[in-house]
C-alpha cells in the first residue's frame, strides 16, 4: 500500500474490435483517449494504492491522456525549512519550524499526534516546474496561492507549478491510532490499539518527503 508498482496489460482482440481505449478519471470525471495500437501492451506506472479505470468505447475523438511522470527527470531541488501548524484533535493549536521533513513516528514530540498538520512554504520559480511531495502518510491536500489542487490519499503526489511566486500549503490528516495508544484510561481505545492480539504498532504519519521540484518540458518540446 505504501509503494508504487508497474503493470503491463494486453487486451483480447475482440474487446478492441471497433473500439478505442479510454482512461476515465474517477476523481474528476474527465475522460482521456489512450493511444494504443492494435496488439500493443498498455504500460501503467502506478503509485501507492493506485488504480485506473480503462473503458473501451466506440468514440474515438478526444483529449489524449498525458500522464504525470512517475519520477520527474532532471536535477531535483529539495525543499527544506517548512513552517508547520499543528491542529490537534484535543483542541490545542501550535506552530513550529522543520528544517527537514520527517515521519512523525521518528519525532518524540509528535509520535502520538492526531489531527491536522499544515506545512507551509513560499518559493519563487523562474520557469514552470514539477512538484513531487514524496512520501506522505495520510490524506493530503495541496493549495498553491490559495487555490486547492485537490485532496489525495493514494498514488504519486506530483503537481505542476507555474513561473513566479508559489505559496505552498500542504494539509495532511493524521489519524487516531497512535494517539489512542496513549489514552490509557480509555478502555475502547486501549482495546483496539494495545491489548493482546490487537496490539497495533506505531504507525507512520505526516509528510516525510522529501519534497522536491524539478524542471518540466516547456510547451512544444
Question: Which role fits each region the language model picked out?
Answer:
Residues 178-221:
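Exposed low-complexity, polar/acidic, P/S/T/G-rich flexible segments that act as propeptides
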Residues 51, 164-182:
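Short, well-structured beta-strand segments enriched in hydrophobic/aromatic residues
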Residues 155, 161-164:
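Glycine-centered tight-turn motifs at strand-turn-strand junctions
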Residues 2, 135-137, 163:
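A generic beta-sheet turn/junction motif
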Residues 1-116, 124-126, 147-152, 173, ...:
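Carbohydrate-binding surfaces of carbohydrate-active enzymes
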Residues 123-145, 152, 168-172:
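Aromatic-lined ligand-binding clefts that engage carbohydrates, nucleic acids, or primary amines
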Residues 44, 159-161, 169-171:
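Ligand-binding pocket scaffold of soluble enzyme catalytic domains
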Amino acid at each position: 500500500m505504501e509503494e508504487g508498482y508497474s503493470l503491463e496489460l494486453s487486451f483480447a482482440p475482440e474487446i478492441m474490435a471497433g473500439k478505442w481505449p479510454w482512461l476515465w478519471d474517477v476523481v474528476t470525471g474527465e475522460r482521456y483517449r489512450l493511444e494504443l495500437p492494435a496488439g500493443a501492451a498498455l504500460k501503467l506506472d502506478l503509485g501507492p494504492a493506485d488504480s485506473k479505470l480503462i473503458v473501451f468505447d466506440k468514440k474515438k475523438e478526444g483529449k489524449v491522456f498525458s500522464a504525470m511522470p512517475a519520477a520527474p527527470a532532471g536535477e531535483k531541488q529539495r525543499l527544506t525549512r517548512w513552517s508547520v501548524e499543528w491542529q490537534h484533535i484535543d483542541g490545542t493549536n501550535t506552530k513550529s519550524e522543520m528544517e527537514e521533513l520527517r515521519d512523525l513516528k521518528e519525532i518524540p514530540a509528535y509520535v502520538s499526534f492526531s489531527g491536522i498538520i499544515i506545512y507551509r512554504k513560499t518559493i519563487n520559480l523562474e520557469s514552470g516546474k514539477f512538484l513531487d511531495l514524496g512520501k506522505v502518510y495520510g490524506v493530503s491536500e495541496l493549495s498553491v496561492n490559495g487555490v486547492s489542487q485537490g485532496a489525495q490519499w493514494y498514488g504519486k503526489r506530483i503537481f505542476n507549478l507555474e513561473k513566479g511566486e508559489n505559496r505552498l500549503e500542504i494539509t495532511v490528516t493524521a489519524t487516531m491510532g497512535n494517539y489512542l495508544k496513549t489514552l490509557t484510561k480509555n478502555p475502547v481505545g486501549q482495546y483496539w490499539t494495545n491489548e493482546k492480539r490487537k496490539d497495533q504498532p506505531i504507525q507512520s504519519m505526516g509528510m516525510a518527503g522529501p519534497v522536491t521540484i524539478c524542471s518540466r518540458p516547456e510547451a512544444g518540446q
